[in-house]
């Protein structure tokens, strides 16, 4: 599976003629390709340089795009190289194009360094898509964190995640699962949920749209359905869970269908265990671990979490001071209403696509602890907006009076008390900051170079071993809480 060379150019990714010829009559053979394969031109015998070939392909693809513009979209330049709309609610197309002009140069420089790095390690490039990578070293980690070339990502993710080992141990399983699905093995509940979510997957991506000239569904939608249904049969403990459609949808842009299936198995079983089960307890455990990390690494935000724990209905009269014991692990703070979805989606839709893909590079190379680093990095970058919110300023002043022993007779205290919102209203204001801030992180380097790649940043102390220990601790704490809250049996 080879991604088209045009994918690394500034040109928007647009269909070529072969796609139009085959889309309407696609069958299960499309399972052997990723969407990117469908845009690959066959230029056997072309001995021109990589740069020259890119320029030729770019011109050719743009000319083809112009011929079919009236059929498929208003302007192909409105879409990025993966088929996503450049324009969003928080980012204009002008902002995107200005950023991309410079970032594209960055990716080209990085790719040349990758090529030299692999050749130095005696690894062949295999038609500009390496199949293997060097042993894990600090140097390789730096390369991954600075971004894997877009056209290499499918094979790189597969290699780093151990996908081939998973496939080799389960030869023929995916085909059998598809056969079982055709025989009615998918539960009615899962089937209904999957069908409902298919066309909700990346509504701003051209590959997931059914165009008027197509007789059937887009190939990627059919692949998405098969993978999700097969997984619901493969792991009945999980079945289908919302957000899986986005995980698989993104994987299908970079790899063939069966590989996308096994990558989903790896994500749900290895990287985020228990997160997608029906009770979502694994998701709650991970949020508890995140709260522990906030307590250790982000004291200003932790101070807000402490002050927000109350004994009653949210009245500001009932602020109780620092959260006691393990309460915050069992009654998770409000901000986890946002951050839980960050983990379940692996940041798909949380940050712009280039930033998402850089996060995925590191997820598959470094495992799930990197998701915690990213979450903390986003919170750190948004900290100033978080703390500058009007309600936070008032709460800090109010808390200083409350814990300082002031009473209702204090005139300043009374004025603050009248101005301040309820804790629920304050939390909603904070949630809006946390929800909106990451959507502006168009440039991956804004979080990677400013926070995640700095040598002296405390977040470097977060390892996979530390996260796994945290998961065990939080799970036990939550189990203790549940056990203590059960009514005791009466003695006979």
From Swiss-Prot:
Under SUPFAM superfamilies, the record lists: Ypt/Rab-GAP domain of gyp1p (SSF47923)
Quote the InterPro entries the UniProt record gives.
Answer: Rab-GAP-TBC_dom, Rab-GAP_TBC_sf, Rab_GAP_TBC_domain
Subcellular location(s): the record lists: Cytoplasm; Bud; Bud neck
Question: Quick check: keyword Iron in the entry?
Answer: no
Please list the coiled coil stretches.
none
Q: Which GO terms describe its biological process?
A: establishment of cell polarity; establishment or maintenance of actin cytoskeleton polarity; exocytosis; formin-nucleated actin cable assembly; vesicle targeting
Q: What is this protein called?
A: GTPase-activating protein MSB4
Q: Which gene encodes it?
A: MSB4
């Amino acid at each position: 599976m080879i991604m088209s060379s045009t994918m690394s150019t500034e040109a928007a990714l647009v269909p070529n003629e072969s796609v139009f010829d085959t889309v309407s009559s696609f069958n299960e053979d499309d399972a052997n390709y990723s969407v990117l394969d469908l845009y690959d031109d066959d230029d056997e015998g072309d001995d021109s340089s990589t740069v020259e070939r890119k320029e030729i392909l770019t011109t050719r693809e743009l000319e083809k795009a112009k011929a079919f513009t009236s059929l498929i979209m208003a302007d192909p330049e409105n879409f990025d190289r993966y088929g996503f709309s450049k324009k969003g609610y928080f980012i204009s197309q002008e902002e995107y194009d200005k950023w991309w002009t410079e970032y594209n140069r960055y990716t080209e420089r990085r790719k040349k360094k990758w090529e030299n790095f692999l050749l130095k390690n005696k690894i062949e490039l295999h038609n500009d898509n390496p199949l293997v990578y060097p042993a894990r070293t600090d140097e390789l980690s730096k390369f991954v964190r600075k971004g894997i070339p877009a056209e290499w990502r499918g094979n790189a993710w597969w290699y780093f995640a151990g996908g081939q080992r998973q496939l080799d141990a389960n030869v023929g399983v995916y085909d059998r699962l598809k056969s079982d699905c055709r025989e009615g093995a998918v539960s009615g509940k899962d089937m209904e949920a999957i069908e409902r979510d298919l066309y909700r997957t990346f509504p701003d991506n051209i590959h997931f749209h059914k165009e008027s000239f197509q007789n059937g569904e887009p190939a990627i939608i059919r692949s998405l359905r098969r993978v999700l249904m097969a997984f619901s049969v493969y792991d009945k403990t999980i079945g289908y869970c919302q957000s899986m459609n986005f995980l698989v949808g993104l994987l299908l842009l970079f790899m063939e269908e069966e590989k996308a299936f096994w990558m989903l198995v790896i994500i749900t079983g290895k990287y985020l265990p228990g997160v997608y089960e029906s009770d979502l307890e694994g998701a709650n455990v991970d949020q508890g671990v995140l709260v522990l990390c906030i307590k250790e690494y982000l004291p200003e935000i932790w101070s807000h979490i402490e002050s927000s724990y109350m004994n009653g209905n949210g009245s500001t009269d009932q602020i109780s001071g620092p959260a006691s014991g393990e309460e915050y692990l069992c009654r998770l703070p409000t901000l986890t209403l946002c951050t839980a979805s960050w983990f379940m989606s692996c940041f798909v839709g949380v940050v712009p696509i280039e930033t998402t893909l850089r996060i995925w590079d590191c997820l598959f190379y470094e495992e799930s602890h990197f998701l915690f680093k990213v979450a903390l990095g986003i919170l750190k970058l948004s900290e100033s907006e978080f703390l500058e919110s009007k309600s936070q300023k008032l709460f800090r002043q109010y808390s200083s009076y409350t814990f300082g022993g002031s009473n209702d007779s204090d005139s300043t205290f009374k004025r603050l008390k009248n101005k301040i919102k309820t804790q629920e209203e304050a939390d909603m204001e904070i949630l809006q900051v946390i929800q909106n801030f990451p959507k502006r992180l168009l440039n991956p380097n804004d979080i990677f170079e400013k926070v995640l790649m700095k040598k002296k940043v405390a977040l470097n102390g977060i390892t996979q071993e530390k996260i796994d220990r945290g998961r065990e601790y939080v799970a036990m704490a939550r189990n203790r809480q549940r056990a203590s809250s059960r009514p005791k049996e009466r003695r006979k």
